[in-house]
Every structure is written in C-alpha cells, then in structure tokens.
Amino acid sequence: MNRADNNTTPWNWPVVDLDIRHGQQRTIPIPSALENVEYALNQLNIRVRYNQMTKEIELTGGNLLTNASLDVGITQLRSQLTAHHLRISKTETWDAVSAIAAKHPYSPVCEYLRECRKNWDGKAHIDDLFCLLKLDPKVQQNTDFCKTLLEKWLISAVRLAFNKGDIAAQGVLILVGPQGIGKTRFLYRLLPHSDWGADGITLDPGSRDDTMRIMRFWIVELGEVGNTLRKERMDALKQYITQKQDVFRKPYARSAEMIPRRTVFIGTVNELPGEGFLRDLTGNRRYWPIAITQVLNLPLDRDQLWGYIMNRAFDCQAPHYLSVAELAQLESLNAQHLLLTTEERLLLDSLNWNAPLDQWHRMTATDVCGDLCISPQNNRKVGRALQNIARRDSRLKTPSNHHQREYLVPPMKAPAWASPDRTEESGTAP
C-alpha cells in the first residue's frame, strides 16, 4: 500500500507525547492510545461495530477490502495507522478495535424488526402464516390452540431478539410430519436473510462447539428432534432451552462472559405412524408440536407478519408463555407424540380397541397382566402403560377406589386361527 497522505493536512491527534531536545519542542511517533485509534478510524471513514446476532466484530469502510476476514482487516488497518505515524502493534490494534466495537453494539435483527413495526399496516397477519401449515387430520389437535402455539413462539422470537438477559424462551415449536413436505422451508419463509437461521442442527447442551455454533443465529432448526431428545440429554436440554443468558467468549477476548440469549429454536421430526418422539410426559411443556401433512407455498408478507408480532409483543404486551389452561391442553397434545414403551405396544397389539364399549371391562393392571400372561413383576410398568394410553384415548377411563385403580379396558383380540372369516387351506390343487 502506498504510504500516502504524508503531504496532507496534519491530523490533530487527541493524545501526543512531547519531547524537548536542544531547546525545541516536537512530537515523537504518535502513541497507541485508544483515543488516537478512534480518531484515526473517524479520519479514515472506517466503521467498527459488534454484531450482537453473529457475535462478531465488523470492520468496514475506508480502503479496507470488502468481505475480507477480520484478521485481514486488522492487518490493513494497522498498516494505515502506521502510515499516519501511529505507533501501534498488531496486538494493540486488536485490543483497541475490540474495545471500540464493544462501545458500538448493534443487531441487524432488531433493526429489521423495528422497521417492520414502524411500517405495520395494523392488520393481524398470523392467519397468513398459519395457512401455510396443512394440519394432520389424524392427530387430535385443536386448530385455535395450534395457532396460539405458533403466535406465542413468534412473540418469544422477537422478545429474545431484544433480550437484555432477563427473558427466556418457554417453548420449542416442533413441526411433526413426513419427510419432504417443506418443514425446513417454513423456517426460511420467516427470515428476510437466510444467514440469520440454521437448519439440521443436532444440539448437545454439553458440547461447547454445539452451543457456540447456534449462538450466531436468530432462529435455529433442530433437525430430527428425536436425536436431540435422546434420554441422556433430556434434563440438560430442558434447562438449556429456558436459559436467559449464555456463557460466551467474544472474538479475541481473554475471558468468557455472560451474554443475553438471542436465539430461539424450532424443531422438525419425521414421525412415523404409531411412533412418537417425546420420551416421557413430564417436562414436555417446553415442546410445542403441530402435526402437519404439508407446508403450502402460499403468498406471505413477511415484513407485515413481523410488524404484527412486534405489536403483539411490545405494544399489547402479549405473553410468550402458556397459561395454566393452555399447559393442560399441551399435555393432552403431547401425549399423542409419546414414544411408546414395550408394554404400551403389547397392550395396543393384544387388545381389541375396535370392540364396542359394552364389551369393555373394568380391570386392574394385575388383571391385565394375568389375561396377557405377563409376569406380575411388570405390574407397575403395565400400570404406567395404561395411564399413558388413557391420556391419549379418553375411552380408557381410570376411575379408582381407595384400594386399587381400575381401567375400562377392551377385550383381548381373538387369535387368527379362531377368526370365523378365515379361509381354510384345502391342501389340494384348485
């Protein structure tokens, strides 16, 4: 680079050292004071900011190369500072830029959302988004409640974008449906810039690499949630989802610090018929499933949608958490997505669930074990299986007296050989 500008008007440095020699006063090489670096950046039209979404320092403007790495930008900046007689090492340049960036934080997500709020047309646009989701008719789910889950999750997304460390997400929206129906595409319909989100992420809360990676995005899709919800990760994941802050070491900082959580999660799962992805009913209030068969490619004014959500979140102060009544609805909904135990599968396969109700009988778990030739040692497991099925099937009533719990249970299936419609094999050629 041409060490130019030596003949231009001298800069009026804020901090200088004076040296008196032979009766004359003169300035020696300019010291690397923070004030001098800030002054030089202003003179060179170079902008330094800290991006709260990506967690990165941005160095732009002046004669710096565009789209270059921060390390390259620091090298170029130091060269320009040296050309203007600023005495500074590369380490000192890093320190100064980091300090200046910390004084100028910004969030591109927040800037976008403020603009959406400013230009909102005053109409509710949640229906426009909800219409993209074709609900699965085979799953018992209330349409209005599904829409409530979607809107409250969106409200949490904008609240966390502006989070100062006092807000926590309350749920992960989970789209349940077959592969190839556009579940991941739904995420990117929400984002004005695709690099604000990430998809197909498997999250292990105990992995520093996993948590560091997802912190750099606004909305993260947890692909194939069943893998993320592995049993050994469940407790850690429940705690992680609702954290208000994250431990993070900013670029080139010497120590880690607590920073506000600004990331929300959406999940996708390819749930097969008769399968589930939730491993137990306790603690599942953090998972908000909507079962769908397709994501439709209908028009959506994304900016107006976020303008409406901003209004709901900050003007109407609408909550992003579920009420007690809504939590009860969620428990009923989640019961349909439980991963079946061995005992549940046995009951579902062995009992005739299509039998008329007048053929059902009140039985204890012990009675059921006896009829199905199950060891009495498994009474408790069978009892829990009956309770889980009862949460999904209201016919399996669970009245109880002071001594035992009885269930209204269907009769056993007739063995195949006893079916009156079975065609006998003659053993002779037709």
Positions of predicted regions on the chain:
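N-terminal nucleic-acid engagement/recognition segments and initiation subdomains in replication
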Residues: 1-125, 144, 377-380, 388, ...
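P-loop NTPase catalytic core of nucleic-acid-dependent motor ATPases
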Residues: 101-215, 369
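Residue-level preference for the first positions of well-ordered beta-strands
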Residues: 172-174, 219, 264
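AAA+/SF3 P-loop NTPase mechanochemical coupling elements
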Residues: 210-215, 249-268
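Conserved AAA+/SF3 P-loop NTPase catalytic/coupling segment centered on the Walker-B
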Residues: 218-241, 277-283
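Conserved catalytic/switch belt of AAA+ P-loop NTPases
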Residues: 234-257
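Phosphate-sensing "switch" segment of ASCE/P-loop ATPases
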Residues: 257-264, 280-346, 353
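Positively charged interface segments
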Residues: 270, 276-277, 281-283, 294-296, ...
